[in-house]
Amino acid sequence: MKNINADDTYRIINKIKACRSNNDINQCLSDMTKMVHCEYYLLAIIYPHSMVKSDISILDNYPKKWRQYYDDANLIKYDPIVDYSNSNHSPINWNIFENNAVNKKSPNVIKEAKTSGLITGFSFPIHTANNGFGMLSFAHSEKDNYIDSLFLHACMNIPLIVPSLVDNYRKINIANNKSNNDLTKREKECLAWACEGKSSWDISKILGCSERTVTFHLTNAQMKLNTTNRCQSISKAILTGAIDCPYFKN
């Protein structure tokens, strides 16, 4: 097994920074897959919109039959990689989950993946600035006796690439889906103080404006967030990262 060259890592990082489309990102993912001596890759990021709704963004070259079955059977509910990535940051080798299932009646996603050619693999959890999470996974169609060594070498290089990958992937897709729904600084301020339990009158005194102005900004924020009341606006703004603690910074 050939060790990963540091120059390859640096080259891929620079190539990712030059990406202008998801097709470009796919090519970089393919290069990364070859670099770690695997066949398949999957970049998946789950973006929450509410406590019950989310969007899933995926770039991959997984076998189509497996992807179709995975979606049709709603295996995301039982996928230990998804569950692990939601609450962890460290890379994980799939063989840890091979004999585990949520319960005896639940499907063992790792074992079922093997029947579709994803025999061995490992994943790197991803966490985004807007409360999204996901994973970057690599897989092989054969039982590789060196999988632990492949995993170890990948752990020394892939984490160096992931920040650039996630940042540029986000920029590309924000540019492709640009809208006029970004909250203004004043709308964020009003929502933030509403988070602290302040009334419109309280907020008006804190911000030095009229109560009517505060109501105006909160109503605009509600329209942009597609919510029906102040409480829902607050929870959705926090959940989706529309507002966060450092918003006071200029």
UniProtKB/Swiss-Prot annotation:
Biological processes annotated in GO: bioluminescence; positive regulation of bioluminescence; positive regulation of DNA-templated transcription; quorum sensing; symbiont-mediated disruption of host cellular anatomical structure
Record annotation: effect of changing residue 115 to S: In strain: ATCC 7744
Organism: Aliivibrio fischeri
Assigned keywords, A-Z: Activator, DNA-binding, Luminescence, Quorum sensing, Transcription, Transcription regulation
UniProt function note: Transcriptional activator of the bioluminescence operon. Binds to the OHHL autoinducer.
SUPFAM superfamilies reported in the protein's UniProt record: C-terminal effector domain of the bipartite response regulators, Pheromone-binding domain of LuxR-like quorum-sensing transcription factors
Family of this protein: Belongs to the autoinducer-regulated transcriptional regulatory protein family.
Ranges annotated as DNA-binding: 200-219
Coiled-coil portions: none
Protein name from the UniProt record: Transcriptional activator protein LuxR
Xref: InterPro entries: Sig_transdc_resp-reg_C-effctor, TF_LuxR_autoind-bd_dom, TF_LuxR_autoind-bd_dom_sf, Tscrpt_reg_LuxR_C, WH-like_DNA-bd_sf
Location of the HTH luxR-type domain: 176-241
Source organism, top-level taxon: Bacteria
Any GO MF annotation of the entry: DNA binding
Gene assigned in the entry: luxR
One Pfam family recorded for the sequence: GerE
